Regions:
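Membrane-interface alpha-helices at helix entry/exit sites of multi-pass transporters
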Residues: 33-39, 70-88, 111-119
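Membrane-embedded alpha-helical segments and adjacent helix-loop junctions characteristic
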Residues: 1-71, 199
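Signature of multi-pass transmembrane helix bundles
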Residues: 1, 103-199
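Membrane-interfacial helix-loop connectors
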Residues: 55, 59-76, 101-114
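Membrane-embedded alpha-helical segments of transport systems
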Residues: 52, 84-98, 118-132
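Alpha-helical transmembrane segments of integral membrane proteins, especially early/N-terminal helices
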Residues: 8-19, 82-85, 146-155
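Conserved active-site and cofactor/substrate-binding residues in soluble primary-metabolism enzymes
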Residues: 13, 17-21, 42, 60, ...
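Membrane-interfacial segments
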Residues: 9-13, 22, 73, 108, ...
Length: 199
């Protein structure tokens, strides 16, 4: 399903447009990837699926991105710098809405399936930040530049706002809002891809 939606996005040019929009950031995190290469779109889609906690969607997208990175790899038996950076970002698991985990907790009879929302938000944000900084130091990538600093500022503001919101509402409302936001984002992405594919 998700690889099919990805194919629609590729054929319509949507993924390339999104990758171009984020290219100032992605090109600095992945300096060895040629500017405008389709793999940047695959990386973006994988990160988006991970942030929504859509494990089943993120896996095929991640495999596709890694396959494309391998095609760019000059040493086929050794992981390239972009592959290492992508793997670290992927496995650190930055999640905005942990849908799958909350569903599993609800299925197992947890009294408050959304209790883990803020701890997951904080831990995955910090793990991703530390991972990116560590790999950037090892690969001598300069993170002190305008696009990266703007992105980090926006992410910090967004996460601060989310945490503030969820600390000031009840657990029941937290579950309702989390599910609603995730479903709207998910549905919106699917509709956007279909509409761009139709045109």
């Amino acid at each position: 399903l998700w690889l099919g939606i990805m194919k629609i996005g590729e054929n319509s040019g949507l993924i390339n447009a999104l990758a171009r929009f984020l290219s100032p950031v992605l090109c600095r995190l992945f300096p060895d990837i040629p500017k405008g290469h389709p793999v940047l779109g695959s990386i973006f889609m994988n990160m988006s699926a991970n942030m929504l906690g859509l494990d089943n969607a993120a896996t095929p997208l991640g495999l596709k991105a890694m396959k494309e990175l391998q095609e760019l790899n000059p040493k086929k038996d050794t992981a390239s710098n972009p592959m290492i950076m992508f793997l670290v970002i992927n496995t650190s698991g930055l999640i905005i809405i942990p849908i799958s985990i909350m569903v599993y907790r609800a299925q197992m009879g947890a009294a408050q399936p959304t209790d883990v929302f803020i701890p997951i938000l904080l831990s995955t944000f910090i793990s991703t930040l530390v991972g990116v900084i560590a790999v950037s130091i090892a690969q001598k990538i300069n993170l002190i530049n305008k696009p990266i600093l703007i992105l980090m500022g926006v992410i910090c503001l967004f996460f601060s706002g989310l945490i503030y919101l969820f600390l000031n509402i009840s657990r029941e409302e937290m579950g309702t809002y989390s599910t609603l936001i995730a479903n709207i984002l998910l549905f919106g992405v699917i509709i956007l891809f279909i509409l761009t594919g139709v045109r």
